[in-house]
Amino acid sequence: MATNVNEEQYLDLIRYVLANGHQKGDRTGTGTKSVFGYQMRFDLSKGFPILTTKKVPFGLIKSELLWFLRGDTNIRFLLQHKNHIWDEWAFKKWVESDEYQGPDMTDFGHRWLKDPEFKQVYLQEKKAFCQRILEDDDFAQKYGDLGLVYGSQWRKWKTSQGDTIDQIANVIQQIKTTPDSRRMIVSAWNPEDVPSMALPPCHTMFQFYVNDGKLSCQLYQRSADIFLGVPFNIASYALLTHMIAHQCGLEPGEFVHTLGDAHIYLNHLDQVKEQLTRTPHEAPKLILPAEPKPIDQYEMTDIKLEGYTHEPAIKAPVAV
């Protein structure tokens, strides 16, 4: 079996944090083993870097990235593709509104994990909420929109003059016309917005680099949940690099993933240790349409993985 060099980058990160991590408290009250400043490099010519030592749901990664690239900030698109990653943020807005008359949902993010009875009520309320977002246009407009999330920051960055900047269109234009530029950057971190945001951006900025007909991308991620979040982030930004390279007539080069606070939650230690006992499979291949579409017009069926063999999923609690 060929060595999966890209996956070893991720498994080495787990080993490094287990061996060298500092025990820290955190916003969620769960506690972590954490290191500061770590970099992984994924050679995109050596297969698509989605983990094979556990199943990673590529459909969720695709629909979320397409949502960002459309500049969409309403969870309705995600729900139409059975993606529930962002539900809680919209649901929170609904249950804290004056219109909501249902059961008390105060601090639902923690309560449903600890109280089985409340969990049933919460899941029922959230399911009804999601169904209403899908069926009721006015309700979806009012409560499905998350405001300042990645889609808005990438495609409609609000300026002090009151207009907007399309950072994705700008960066594609730069790659095509001034490929040696050192300013090919997309930022999601706006200090003015951070205090009022539900969750300040974890992926704060990314930069592109062109060399020898290849496009590389580096992401700076301020906060990295190694077991649950990072596998998604690697696959998402690798997919983004492939798609933008395709737009610009380039081959994908490297995805460089730089982490700020890289942490394993204390309630994920058994899971990462189990993952380290597994042997990686060969990396799959990403298939995109022969001719690129406009970046905001890709459909789910345009993006495929070929030969994705993986070990079973490993369940773990989310820290909220």
From Swiss-Prot:
Pfam families: Thymidylat_synt. Pathway: Pyrimidine metabolism; dTTP biosynthesis. It is found in: Cytoplasm. Its main location: cytoplasm. It catalyses: dUMP + (6R)-5,10-methylene-5,6,7,8-tetrahydrofolate = 7,8-dihydrofolate + dTMP. Its EC number is 2.1.1.45. DUMP binds at residues 27, 182-183, 222-225, 233, 263-265. (6R)-5,10-methylene-5,6,7,8-tetrahydrofolate binds at residues 225, 319. The active site is at residue 202. GO terms for cellular component: cytosol. Keywords: Cytoplasm, Methyltransferase, Nucleotide biosynthesis, Transferase. The keyword Metal-binding does not apply. GO terms for biological process: dTMP biosynthetic process; dTTP biosynthetic process; methylation. GO terms for molecular function: thymidylate synthase activity. Catalyzes the reductive methylation of 2'-deoxyuridine-5'-monophosphate (dUMP) to 2'-deoxythymidine-5'-monophosphate (dTMP) while utilizing 5,10-methylenetetrahydrofolate (mTHF) as the methyl donor and reductant in the reaction, yielding dihydrofolate (DHF) as a by-product. This enzymatic reaction provides an intracellular de novo source of dTMP, an essential precursor for DNA biosynthesis. Homodimer. NCBIfam families: PRK01827.1-2, thym_sym. This is Thymidylate synthase.
